Swiss-Prot record:
Pathway membership: Amino-acid biosynthesis; L-histidine biosynthesis; L-histidine from 5-phospho-alpha-D-ribose 1-diphosphate: step 1/9
Reaction equations catalysed: 1-(5-phospho-beta-D-ribosyl)-ATP + diphosphate = 5-phospho-alpha-D-ribose 1-diphosphate + ATP
Organism: Bacillus licheniformis (strain ATCC 14580 / DSM 13 / JCM 2505 / CCUG 7422 / NBRC 12200 / NCIMB 9375 / NCTC 10341 / NRRL NRS-1264 / Gibson 46)
Phylogenetic placement of the source organism: Bacteria, Bacillati, Bacillota, Bacilli, Bacillales
HAMAP family named among the record's database cross-references: HisG_Short (MF_01018)
Matches recorded under SUPFAM superfamilies: Periplasmic binding protein-like II
Pfam families per record: HisG
UniProt name for this protein: ATP phosphoribosyltransferase
Length: 213
């Protein structure tokens, strides 16, 4: 039997889409896998172990080697800048990082305060735009900041834009498109390159197949 592979997966939508991809790639995951409340799930038939984590923590687990590979959004990779290999764009969980605000202030570059849970990405973006802003880090409900006068603009993940519209906000600038990526711990890749390459290859075939539809 080959070496066991530990995979860090984020809870939520990315988990569901990634599990579906793994099944399409031929990995036999049990039915209860999707609904399990366990944080560590063993799949001995495939020699896999899954760690279920918060999206922002996946890169930490992979960087420190407690997980060999992980599935993380590009937004997290840009924000955290961890020492991991990004080996495959899975092309799932598509969304974008964008700037938004109230209609009367969103386009006002004089608004100096920007609320976000991505302070590094936001700082870099506005620096490139030649804007001096004060970044206010929040951990959730970013859309609230302009409504209560905490910040003139926000930087956040946008999928359909429905949450922005429901709160009277408008998107003014797209920073970048976001998808989920397969990431690898550098040491794990040296020790388990064959099994990691096989997983990346099998998933890559699924990605290309979906693009061809």
């Amino acid at each position: 039997m080959g070496k066991e592979l530990t995979i860090a997966m984020p809870k939520g939508r990315i988990f569901e889409e990634a599990a579906d991809m793994l099944r399409k790639a031929g990995y036999q995951l049990p039915e209860e896998f999707d609904d399990s409340r366990k944080l560590i799930i063993q799949v001995p038939e495939e020699n896999l172990r899954f760690i279920l984590a918060k999206p922002m923590d996946v890169t930490t687990y992979v960087e420190h080697g407690v997980a060999d590979v992980g599935i993380a959004g590009k937004d997290v990779l840009l924000e955290e800048e961890r020492d991991v290999y990004e080996v495959l764009d899975l092309n799932i969980s598509k969304c974008r990082l964008a700037v938004a605000g109230l209609p009367e202030t969103a386009a006002d570059t004089v608004a100096p305060r920007v609320a976000t849970k991505y302070p590094n990405v936001a700082s870099s973006y506005f620096r490139e735009q030649g804007e001096q802003v004060e970044i206010i880090k929040l951990n959730g409900s970013i859309e609230l900041a302009p409504l209560i006068g905490l910040a003139g603009r926000i930087v956040d993940i946008v999928s359909t834009g429905q949450t922005l519209r429901e709160n009277g906000l408008v998107e003014t600038e797209k920073i970048c498109d976001i998808t989920s990526r397969l990431i690898v711990n550098p040491v794990s890749y040296r020790m388990k390159d064959a099994v990691i390459d096989e997983m990346a290859s099998r998933l890559s075939l699924i990605v290309e197949g979906e693009k061809a539809k």
